Amino acid sequence: MILILFYIILLFEIINGIWCLYRVIRYNNHNNKLTENSNESKLENSKILIVIPCLREQDIIISTLQHFLKLTSNYENIKILVVTTQKEEYEKQKYLYLQDDLKEDVKNNIDIKKMITKYNKILSTMELKDILKLKLNNNIDRIVENKVKNSKTTSKIVEEYIESRKLRDKVYHKHYPNNEGIMADQLNYVLNNFNFIDEGNYYYSVYNADSIPSENTIKEILKTIEKNKQPKVIQQYSAPISNWNNLSAIMKGFAIYQSNFELRYGLINSNIPNRLLYTYVVGHGMYIRVDVLKKIGGFETKYWCEDIYMSYVLRTKNIPICPIKTLELMQSPQYLSILTRQNAVWFKTSFECLKIFKDVFRKNKKINLNSLGWMIQRLRMNMTWFGLPIAFLYTIIVAILNQNIGILTVATLTYLSMILLEYGSIIRLLENTSKIKLGNKFKILLYTTAAATISNIGPIYSLISQKKEKYKTIR
């Protein structure tokens, strides 16, 4: 029985690798046909509101705003809105008591990763790094006190920037007034408090504070709206490689691992419509018509990842996701500890897929093939995410216990073949789509192999920690 399971795992790995390679090849063929048949079209004058929700984004929000202003400078029908939250100010005041601990940790030369995790609610990452540069200064206590005292919230920084540059006709700012809540609450606050005129011709777009969509994004979005006669949902998928050169080897591996998910289940599956394939929207790079968004009840606040819930709702209502080819480049976490917590947040909502299924059923009182297909696929993905590294470990342990170098070699080569077929094809697709050369492919595959082998650290942490509060990814 042990060896039967061993060979079943090996068979699954080979099938998975071949299936992944096949879908990339099919996408490339499909994409080439679209390119050959594409024509320039008149850009529809649909209105777009780009919403950027922020919580402790002091370090990057201005550069992000500058990027979006440049991106939309030629379009009067596109506006930008930053929505901050009172939660940021509330938590800063709540954790000010840590100031004395911070002074001691600076003097004791505590690791920067630990300091960022512990003190991110009272100082930004850049502010903490600035303090560490002066750690040998005799007046370090005063330096810390002044830094904390003069630290500005994201809301304050945004307001000052808009006012000083006279941007109120192009950039709006709304401030979610509650001390609690998650990103979905901020997004719903905008949905309910912004004056959308002609909702069927107005798109509500969401981007993160670290989003860097390319110059071609807006053009392709408007062409997609025109070509598809105002589709209900448009999605720009992403790749976390904007800070590629600042990542360690293992974190580069995880950047490819995450890009694989985005491109395979997002870009590829959305371009090849099939009820058996899993498709999803992401909480950044999404464009959804305001009338549709209001009809489905806005953004779900019961679950930490509102996009997983929305993906299911769209699937049950048979609302297709219209993808664009241009990728959004975003940051990848620089530290494994931060990535683990980020993945734990994603897995928590994913793990609650049966609960989501029941919640939506109570509202709609009906089940269709789309909803069943989504749930089955999500369960399969959860099992793969959590179980594949364990399955590989199982094959290695079985080979060692049997003291059989032959099956150890087969187990290792089968796993590496799966990695090569799955991620080798994705690395090439990622480079072609993003127009960025990532470097030595052999090294990247080694990094990705290491990351894939421990890719269930987030799910494991999620099940063990049982955190009651959503983790905010630290930039």
At which residue positions do the language-model features occur?
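Long helical/loop segments within the catalytic core of UDP-sugar-dependent glycosyltransferases
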Residues: I162-K166, I182-D198, E215-Y303, A344-K355, ...
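Short, well-formed alpha-helical segments that are part of the catalytic scaffolds
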Residues: E57-K70, Y90-K94
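Active-site-proximal specificity loops/subdomain of glycosyltransferases
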Residues: K92-N201
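Short, acidic, metal-binding catalytic loop of nucleotide-sugar glycosyltransferases
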Residues: Q66-N77, Q86-E89, D101-E104
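Short beta-strand-to-loop acidic/aromatic patch adjacent to the donor-nucleotide binding site
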Residues: D198-I212
